[in-house]
C-alpha cells in the first residue's frame, strides 16, 4: 500500500484505527463537478434564466471558472467568497472578452436575493437564503439551511466504468476515485439525471 495508505478505496462502513495511518479515500472534486453540471443544466432548461438571480457560494475560490458559464444564462450573478481577489482576476478576463460582470463580496447576506445558489463544495455555515431558494451543493450542509437544498446526484455511469465498479462502492464514490486518482477527467462532463436531498 505504501504512500497510498491515506487514499484507500473502501466502503463507508469500513473504519481504521486512528493510529494505523490508513484512511479512506475522499475527494470532493468529482461531486463538485456533478453539482455545477446539474446547475448549468437546470439553467439551460429555464424559460427565462436571465430573470433569475444566481449566487455562487465558493468561500475558497475553487470554482472560478463556473462564473463564465453562469453568466451565459443570466447577468444577475453574485459571488460569495473569502478570496475576492481571485474572482476579480477571473471577472476582469470575462469583462474583457464578453463585457459581462458580476458582484463579488464576502457578505453572506447577499445570498438572500438569490433564486438559485450554487455551492460546489460542502456548506459549513448557516447561509441567509430565502425559503423558496434552490440550493445545489456537494454533501449534506453542516448547518440547517432554509430553502430547497439538494446534494445527492443520480447519474448513469458510463458502461466501461460500470463494469469495473467493485460491489459495495457507490457509483459516485467510484467515479470520484477514477476522476481524482485515475485522471479520468471525461467523467467530469457527466450531467446528473436528477438531484435529491
What would you call each of these model-derived segments?
Residues 1-7, 19, 47-51, 70-73, ...:
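Flexible, charged surface loops at secondary-structure boundaries
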Residues 2-34:
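Phosphate/diphosphate ligand-binding glycine-rich loop within oxidoreductases
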Residues 11-14, 56-60, 80-84, 118-123, ...:
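Structural motif
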Residues 15-19, 63-66, 84-91, 124-127, ...:
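Short, charged/polar "capping" segments at the starts of alpha-helices
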Residues 34-52:
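Short internal alpha-helix immediately C-terminal to a glycine-rich phosphate-binding loop
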Residues 46-110:
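Glycine-rich phosphate/diphosphate-binding loop of Rossmann-like nucleotide-binding domains
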Residues 103-162:
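Rossmann-like adenosine-cofactor binding region
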Residues 136-197:
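Adenosine-phosphate binding glycine-rich loop
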